[in-house]
Amino acid sequence: SQGVSKSEITLGSIQDLSGPLAGFGKQLRMGMQLRVDEVNEQGGVNGRKLNLKFEDSGYDPKRAVLAAQKLVNQDKIFAMVGHIGTAANVATFPVLFPKNVINFYPLTGAREMFEQPNQRLKYAFSVPYYDQARTGTPRLVKEKGAKKACAIYQDDEFGLEVLRGAEDGLKTIGMELAEKTSYKRGATDFSSQVAKMKAAGCDFVVLGTVIRETIGTIAESRKTGFSPTFLGTTAAYTDLVHKLGGKAMDGLYATMAVQVPYLDEASQPIRFWANKYKTKFNEDP
């Protein structure tokens, strides 16, 4: 298999280091590099050191394909690790799989990350966005006593997964979306979408959004006096949301697939890891 020699295993990772998820992409790159350094300090994997190469997609599927072509054909990676973005991952599959390159633990909860075809080369860890929205939406709607559930979603494979999950979840409690509205990937103005949901009288909004767009949607809503309950997925929330969005983000709910490493309340193993991260990079994870 390519990417494996007697002394080294070459891995690749495509992150968003210049687009709407750049802050998160930087954290992901540093976190993965920290773990690779730990493994190498302990002698590697079966005596082989890990060599992790990063490329930047800017959260653009076309750039992701170019990055994958470089990593697969030039750098000869054994596996793609932690590639971020649903559409970006799907776009790179035709580059990876003909060369038997594994797609390992992508940073997306799309079902395409583990379903056929080529499922033997797909290793996913996240609860699917569809199931996050399908289970989380009816539970929180009932808990909040919401009467008009609505959705704003990114107009791509990721956003549609969240939308479908929300719709199917609401069916289980005899409801349907009162309104839905979408935005193009990379958008920064959400005034028309917020106005549409406000006019519909939505008191509950499912967010098929990523980090920057989560902040933008909620900030615009607060500015116009629109204050429904907001529910996002794992893609909608990291601690960057409240760090960058401030008090306006109070009251946001999100489904999570892993424990967020808050230093003051995480489990002991996570606190241990988080403190190592802070020591190495001089910032909270």
Show which residues each predicted segment covers.
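Sec-exported extracytoplasmic/periplasmic mature domains
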Residues: Q33, D37-G44, Q69-I77, F93-V101, ...
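Beta-alpha junction/loop-to-helix N-cap segments that form part of ligand/metal-binding clefts
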Residues: T10, G23-M30, Q42-E115, Y183-F190, ...
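Extracytoplasmic "Venus flytrap"
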Residues: S1-Q33, E55-K62, I84-G85, I152-L160, ...
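Extracellular/periplasmic periplasmic-binding protein-like sensory domains
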Residues: V127, I218-P285
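Extracytoplasmic ligand/sensor domains, especially the bilobed periplasmic-binding protein
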Residues: K62, K76-T181, T229-A254
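Immediate post-signal peptide segment of exported/extracytoplasmic ligand-binding proteins
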Residues: S1-S13, E41-L50, V141-K147
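Short, surface-exposed alpha-helical segments at coil->helix boundaries
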Residues: K26-Q33, R134, G159-E167, S267, ...
